[in-house]
Amino acid sequence: MIIGHKRILDFLKKSVANKHLAHAYLFAGPSHLGKRRVATEFIKMLNGQEAGENIDPDVLIVEPEILEKEGVIKELEIGISQARRIQHQMSLFPYQASYKIALIDRAGRMTREASNCLLKTLEEPTGKAILILITSNSRLLLPTIVSRCQLINFLPVKESEIKKGISDKSLDDKTLSQIVRLSNGRPGLAIQYLNDQSLLEDQNKIISQLEKLLRMDINDRYQYVEKIAKDVPKARQILNYWLFWFRDLLLLGTGCPDLVLYSQALPYKGSYSLPKLKKIIQTIKKTDWYLSNSSINARLALEVLMLEI
């Protein structure tokens, strides 16, 4: 099920119908907007069937692998060997479908070597091959890669569309409205909350933990960091919730209380100056970027953040 993005879907349908296709597409926008779902639908438009997880000989799906080692969970980078698989895929003629397709999810996780290998593929496109890249931040890609792709920007979806898309008779209107509001224009999050409402409780626990953290001394903060740094994907999820909490404080400080997501932020109105809040938000974003890079020490990056908040 795809919620929203009608303009993008109509554009892709028209491109397929008119056979006016680019050799490469870049689907860019914040996480949980539905970029992967739209990409899968696009592949179905092109080849007339669902994109299986690498069971279709004409479709190759590449994404970062998750590694757990000595109790530490990390998302690996997309390396040169995976880029060469893509290069090989794009050099072949379709086996039974109309196009050879390679989809790279979280393309910003490519190493420099992998990026350069992919660039060579883009510089020598073949007529029956299409590459789809998905990223939450196009600035993580080489500018030369971005310039060779048809850029498709994904924007947050209207609350009314999300509410209609996830309408569930088993939910009371208050819970449904809460899910829609907390999704903040991201249908993927709304679906996650709908399928597992314990995530709403987890989110509240994370915000409560943040409130406690703000009252801790630096040694206790570092102990907390040592714990969460062992699971980098989870740590990034925590940072995302923190980001919206501090964003709420910024909204309160600028006279926009109706846009606040977390009611827990209300008592903290005025606790930080606006310049300080902007700096904290920038630091959280920077820390999240550091955590997305598996070569950077996650614990060190989080400790630096503790000094800022």
Model-based region annotation:
Residues 91, 116-133:
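Conserved catalytic/switch belt of AAA+ P-loop NTPases
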Residues 105-106, 133-138:
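A short beta-strand-to-loop transition that corresponds to the Sensor-1 phosphate-sensing loop
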Residues 1-45, 49-51, 127-129, 137-241, ...:
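Charged, glycine-rich active-site and insertion segments that engage polyanionic ligands
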Residues 109, 124, 140:
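Residues immediately C-terminal
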Residues 1-113:
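Clamp-loader machinery-focused feature within the broader ASCE/P-loop NTPase space
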Residues 88, 120, 147:
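Conserved adenine-binding aromatic site and its adjacent loop/helix in ATP-hydrolyzing domains
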